[in-house]
Amino acid sequence: MSTQPSKDLETFPNPRPERDFVLHMRIPEFTCLCPKTGQPDFATIHLDYVPDERCVELKSLKLYMWSFRDQGAFHEAITNEILDDLVRATEPRYMKVTAEFYVRGGIYTTVVAEHRKPGWAPAPKVELA
């Protein structure tokens, strides 16, 4: 596997496709470029998903995230591009990408984008006393 930034996302078979479970990933070193100024924008990306048949491989996810370092785009566009690419690669039951961009001009920006597979609904929440 390469150690260079890459838009290629590798996947592997879900080891327990019969069960809904949540994967939570925190990516604290995301960087892209402001399309207006060319200055770097920094963010923490949170990826939460319920896999179906495929899971994303972590090293390829890291290299995928690195591939944005020289890409200029608005926060909203980047967040939705990440979601679209990950949904295309894994076809999850549910996926949410939350991008928390660090302060720029005195403003923090958080963008949340979600995907839900048609017909899928989470199990009811269980409350234990």
UniProtKB/Swiss-Prot annotation:
Residues annotated as the enzyme's active site: 34, 41
A GO molecular-function descriptor: preQ1 synthase activity
InterPro entries per UniProt: GTP-CH-I_C/QueF, NADPH_dep_7-cyano-7-deazaG_red, QueF, QueF_type1
Principal EC category: oxidoreductase
Pathway recorded for this protein: tRNA modification; tRNA-queuosine biosynthesis
EC assignment: 1.7.1.13
Disulphides: none
Residues the entry annotates as binding substrate: 56-58, 75-76
Record protein name field: NADPH-dependent 7-cyano-7-deazaguanine reductase
Organism of origin: Alkalilimnicola ehrlichii (strain ATCC BAA-1101 / DSM 17681 / MLHE-1)
